[in-house]
């Protein structure tokens, strides 16, 4: 039995659909398309600009950009894809953990 049939009829401005039958909205892929458009627009927004080439040929410069594959939510641009092994590994790269916390308080000074 349909419970909507007991309500008084009120004129509505939208399209009329049967209230007792389950009507499913057609599945659309809009969120996926919106996500792709957003990623493309963000990628297009970051255009590399060489401020000081330091005597190097600007055509030979290589630009690294942040990708979501290597995420770091605390400081996303600090650890820019530092490989820990493989062909791109370099010994002079600092791979140690960084402390981004608030420094601890000196409790002896606060007790007085």
UniProtKB/Swiss-Prot annotation:
Entries under InterPro entries matching the protein: CIMIP3-like (IPR054446)
Top-rank taxon: Eukaryota
Keyword annotations from UniProtKB, A to Z: Cell projection, Cilium, Cytoplasm, Cytoskeleton, Flagellum
Pfam family, one: CIMIP3
Region Disordered, residue ranges: 1-34
Keyword Cytoplasm: yes
Compartment(s) of residence: Cytoplasm, Cytoskeleton, Flagellum axoneme
Positions of disulphide bridges: none
PANTHER family per UniProt: RIKEN CDNA 1700001C19 GENE (PTHR35444:SF1)
Family assignment from sequence similarity: Belongs to the CIMIP3-like family.
Entry protein name: Ciliary microtubule inner protein 3
Organism per entry: Homo sapiens
């Amino acid at each position: 039995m349909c419970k909507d049939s007991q309500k008084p009829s009120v004129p509505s401005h939208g399209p009329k659909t049967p209230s007792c039958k389950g009507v499913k909205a057609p599945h659309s892929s809009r969120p996926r398309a919106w996500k792709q458009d957003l990623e493309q627009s963000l990628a297009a927004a970051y255009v590399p600009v060489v401020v000081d080439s330091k005597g190097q040929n600007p055509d030979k410069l290589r630009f690294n950009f942040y990708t979501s594959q290597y995420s770091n939510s605390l400081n996303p641009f600090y650890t820019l894809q530092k490989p820990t092994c493989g062909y791109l590994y370099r010994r002079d790269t600092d791979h140690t953990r960084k402390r981004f916390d608030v420094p601890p308080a000196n409790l002896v000074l606060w007790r007085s």
